[in-house]
Amino acid sequence: MATLYDVPPEELIEALTETLADEDDIEAPDWAEFTKTGVDRELPPEQEDFWTRRAASLLRKVAVDGPVGVNALRSEYGTSKQGTTRYRVRPHQKTKGSGNIIRTALQQLEDAGYVETSENDGRRVTGDGRSLLDDTAGDLLTELDRPELERYA
């Protein structure tokens, strides 16, 4: 049986995005189209499926690193700020990602039953979330035609 560790993360997140798009609980709030993903960004994301893609990425991150809190996930989704994109005259500074986007997406994943809050530890994946990840990875492993992944099939 394939697990989420057996397939490339990019492929798994792409497949999870398609799966989570069908969920009623996972949908972008009204403010999401105007919100930047961090203080280092100048514009909001341009992807149409940004919210479900971020939720899929968060589900995988919580499964791999969990239990994990919002602040640790903010550090994961942050980048280095270098001043404006035009000049880049400042030295690199590490910035954190948007906590509101992460928190709201995690709350939606909780409502869908894929993530739960553990006492004083942060959030972790439920059994339903783990089975969704593993089933998606198994389906993806049979679809991928890559010789280096055949040992997992």
From Swiss-Prot:
Highest taxon in the source lineage: Archaea
InterPro entries named in the record: Ribosomal_eS19, Ribosomal_eS19_archaeal, Ribosomal_eS19_CS, WH-like_DNA-bd_sf, WH_DNA-bd_sf
Keywords recorded for this protein, A-Z: Ribonucleoprotein, Ribosomal protein
SUPFAM superfamilies: Winged helix' DNA-binding domain (SSF46785)
Tagged with keyword Acyltransferase: no
Biased composition regions of type Basic and acidic residues, renumbered to the chain: 120-133
Pfam families recorded: Ribosomal_S19e
Quaternary structure and partners: Part of the 30S ribosomal subunit.
Name of the featured protein: Small ribosomal subunit protein eS19
Gene name per UniProt: rps19e
